Amino acid sequence: AKVEKASSNIKDVVSDFVMVTTPSSAHKDVARQLAPYVHKDMIIILNPGRTFGAIDFANELKKCGVIELPHIAETQTIVYTCRRSSDNQTTIFALKTDVKIAALKKSSLEIIMSKMPDCLKPYFKPENSIGYTSFANVGMVLHCSPVLMNIGWIESEKVDFKYYYDGISKSVATFIQKIDDERMAVAKAAGYEIESVADWLRRTYGVVGKDLYECIRNNGAYKE
């Protein structure tokens, strides 16, 4: 689809169906900017929500004086894999399948899915609770620790560094697997059965690998 309008002023582009695709660190700022235009029939999807992003977003709207909250949902991860290929260009390498989505209010989910554009709907799979989408947040495993372990490479502008393919070596993969094990254990204790990151990679990208390291290495979308 063609982009109808782009603007740095949120007032110019806000609609009744909003997909927030910023990092979670920007969610509160987006909520504050959206607050003057929010209404009870609006749909807001945090793509991704990360960990309980829907709750955080709703609380920020309330702080801004919003009384009747819109329909708010969160996804476990962003629906596409992309990289910035130049200052003004982004390349999408893959669209993820069965991205889990849940609503702050269970009654909102059917409304949200019915209003979702047909071009996006096939990529999302509804879940009953944002507890599931939050614990199923694979970004907490794939992003945080590898960034700390590769901060030197990341800050070196002259290095041709590919975050997943170069940054997640065998030792890094072994470390984040332990984080993933703990994530799944905490989720299970809270009543949620979630898949491992390795299983998520197999399901989402169709990769083959005996462990997390091999699944990352065999993911063509991570080689760019």
Label each region the model flagged.
Residues 1-15:
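Conserved N-terminal Rossmann-fold NAD(P) cofactor-binding segment
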Residues 24-86:
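Rossmann-like NAD(P)(H) cofactor-binding subdomain of soluble oxidoreductases
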Residues 18-19:
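N-terminal Rossmann-like NAD(P) cofactor-binding module of classical short-chain dehydrogenase/reductase
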Residues 59, 79-179:
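Substrate/ligand-engaging "lid" and interaction regions
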